């Protein structure tokens, strides 16, 4: 989801920077809320050297965003619009996670949600797919950040280890990007 919707994003940034002081933190945003972030969050972003990656959607006022970024001396980029989309889900759950994980382009985009961390978004967004398509992909898998004795080394080890969720992914299959219209099709998400 959109990270700037999270009222505790500043706390997350501070905690991650404290645990992993040399890790590059990137906020990937659609840009719609960027101009409304308040001074305390801007200060945290600057102090912890957070980079902001902004989707360059046509509805955004590029000039205002560029001015905002420059006025606040933020590290940011405007990413080009989408030309293709990839489907990768395998609802049968019969993929070999040890084969899929090393090829996964999402495995290096660490996500935080509800006190958990995972190498990708899938454990935290599967419920949307499950609800709409009446499927049972695993939900809420991830590293419990409140686990007793958990340290940065253990987190790092688990982030590079395939999850059970990986069995429900496949190799990416790209297709031309277009706005989806209801009713949505499983074929837009599933390879098998």
Language model: regions and residue ranges:
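Short, surface-exposed linear patches
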Residues: 19-20, 48-51, 74-77, 132-134, ...
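Conserved glycine-rich "GG(E/T)P / GGGxP" loop and the immediately following alpha-helix
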Residues: 1-102
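Short loop/turn microsegments at loop-to-beta-strand junctions
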Residues: 105-108
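Short, acidic, Ser/Thr-enriched surface-loop or helix-capping motifs
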Residues: 111-112
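Disulfide-bonded cysteine motifs in exported proteins
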Residues: 99, 161-164, 185
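Hydrophobic "anchor" residues
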Residues: 117-118
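C-terminal accessory region of radical SAM enzymes
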Residues: 70-81, 122-176
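Radical SAM enzyme core and accessory elements
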Residues: 169-192
């Amino acid at each position: 989801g959109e990270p700037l919707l999270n009222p505790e994003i500043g706390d997350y940034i501070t905690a991650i920077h404290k645990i992993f002081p040399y890790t590059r933190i990137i906020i990937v945003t659609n840009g719609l809320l960027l101009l409304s972030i308040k001074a305390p969050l801007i200060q945290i972003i600057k102090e912890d050297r957070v980079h902001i990656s902004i989707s360059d959607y046509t509805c955004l006022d590029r000039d205002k965003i560029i001015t905002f970024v420059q006025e606040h001396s933020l590290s940011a980029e405007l990413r080009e619009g989408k030309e293709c989309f990839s489907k990768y889900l395998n609802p049968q759950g019969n993929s070999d996670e040890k084969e899929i994980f090393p090829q996964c382009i999402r495995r290096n985009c660490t996500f935080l949600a509800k006190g958990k961390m995972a190498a990708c978004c899938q454990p935290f967004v599967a419920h949307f797919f499950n609800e709409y398509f009446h499927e049972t992909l695993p939900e809420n898998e991830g590293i419990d950040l409140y686990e007793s004795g958990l340290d940065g080394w253990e987190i790092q080890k688990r982030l590079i280890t395939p999850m059970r969720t990986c069995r429900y992914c496949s190799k990416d299959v790209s297709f031309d990007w277009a706005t989806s219209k209801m009713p949505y099709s499983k074929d837009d998400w599933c390879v098998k």
